[in-house]
Every structure is written in C-alpha cells, then in structure tokens.
C-alpha cells in the first residue's frame, strides 16, 4: 500500500464532493433538540453526540476509508506505528483503509466536518470540538484489559533550573501547546491559579505547536517551563528522544481521559458497527504497546460519561466547545504557527552562509 496509500488519501481528501457538503447543510431540517451541537447536527436522544441521519439515503458507505490520529507530536512518528492496525482494519472491515497524517487539531476537525475523514483519533481537548462541530461520535480509547487509562497535565522544567513550584514561574517563559489542547492550554488556565500562577496575568503562554515541541523547548532553554500531557512526556523518554533525568516535574494534575477514537455520525450504521467490532478485537503489536505506555487494546467509551471532566475544564476556562470558541482558538493556532515560522525563517537568515567548495 506504500506509506498507507498516501497518494490515494490525497485523492480522496481532495475529491470530497460539494454534494456531500450540501447534504450536510440540509441535514436535520427538523430537530427537536440540538444541545451544544452545530446546526448541521441533531441530538434528539440527548446523549451529547450527533444522531445518525433520519434519511437512510444520507448514510455514507465509502469504498475507501480515510483516518487520522491527533498530531500531539510530529505526525510522522505514528505513520509506522499504526501500519499494522491499518492493515488489520482493511482485512476486518473489508475496505481499503488509508492513514493520513494531519498537521493540526483544527485541520483534523475540519477534515471530518467536511467528510474527508471517516474516523479519527482526537486528543482530549479537541474531542469536544470534533463532537460539537464535526459530528464525531467517540467510541473507543486506548487501555489495558478492562481499564481505560488516562494521563495527567504535568508542568515540566529543566532539572538544573531553580524552579520548585508553579508560583516560581511568574514572569518566565512558559510553553503551552495549542489553543484547543486540554493539558496543553485549557487545563493550565483552570488548575494553575490554584497553585499561585495565573495564565495571562503572571505569564503570557507561548504556543509551541505540540507537546513534544514544548518538552524539547524546555530542554534547549527556549522555555522555562512547559505544560504538557504526561503520556507524551513518558513516550519521549521511553523512545530515547529525551533523558528523563534532564527534567523535573513540579506539578501533576488529577487524571484526564486520553485520546478518543471517533467515527463520523453519518456512516452507514452497519459500517459503524463493524468499525467498533474491529477496534475492540485488535490487540496492539509490541511496538504499539511500547509506544502507548503499555496499553494493548481499544476499549468502549462514551462522550457523555468519559469526557465529563474535560467538558467541565473547558467551561471553567471560558472555552466551551462551540463555533465561536473554535474560531477564536483556530485563529490563535494559526497566528502561533505563523509567528513560529517567521521566527524560524529569521533565525535561518542569521546563520552564516556555508563556505563554497
């Protein structure tokens, strides 16, 4: 299939038809209850996720399935890790299945909203936006036996630094990851003030673009502290990207649920059921188990129950999972990316030219 059929993925992504968007725009013309969902969707059973279309003609049953995984780190990291799983899905579901790397949370959400992604793994915070704005239905999370394992927000500093508590970081360079991230932005805004450090008052968060980039930035001295997900930090240490002893954790939050796996609400019900079956029956390869901190399978979840604490953090941080908040966060994400690119270009321009041979 070659890099998970990346060429096919580009064709499928680029070829999302206008008729699909028109169908989505006219969906759920008569909706008895919508809740927090976008106007494209309906939630008449009040389970907080989009109902399937009332008209069976609007069910989607694509010949090629396209999926993605949250870009909490460099998307290339997961290309080979997920290859055996993608191959399992092809055989189990009986459809060509393509893994497509996405570069940002907003790009992943937009791809599902427009019909270009059929299922995807979303990180904790963006799951709420994916549910409300893209019609995503979370159904699985990584875990071990009967336990879905979570992660913590951790505040990471250099081991040699003088910082012992969050309050020591007032006026310092603190990295957040992306505006829609739970542990990388929203949770610090809610939880850090309890420890004497207020975002935007005591420090101006610097958006790094990823949890791995934040950790590496602390190691290189670009940041004094970084708010990141513990599972990403642990994976970086396990694979040797960083040395754990070079860092200290000065704060650790209560547990949050980890990334969710969700399919589009308008997939044909039989296809959605088959995806659930194929996820739950898969056992991770040794490489996947190592990469995901010992997890060895996918377990059932629901957005209503398992994401309750995350929704509460979003509300308390002033970032509810609605279109207005999403547009604001997307602009911040784009601005941060543009600023970082400009800084990188300026830094490159200052480098002395290589001597001519």
Question: Language-model segments: what does each one mean?
Answer:
Residues 113-122, 135-137, 172-174, 219-228:
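Alpha-to-beta junction loops
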Residues 130-142, 236-250:
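Ligand-binding "clamshell"
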Residues 67-90, 125, 145-216, 223-225, ...:
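Bilobed "Venus flytrap"/periplasmic-binding protein-like clamshell domains
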Residues 96-103, 201-210, 248-251:
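Short beta-strand-to-loop elements that line the ligand-binding cleft
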Residues 70-71, 145-154, 241-279, 286-309:
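Periplasmic-binding protein-like
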Residues 100-135, 233-238:
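Pocket-flanking alpha-helical
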Residues 1-13:
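Bacterial N-terminal signal peptides that target proteins for export
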Residues 25-107, 291-357:
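N-terminal hydrophobic or amphipathic helices and topogenic motifs
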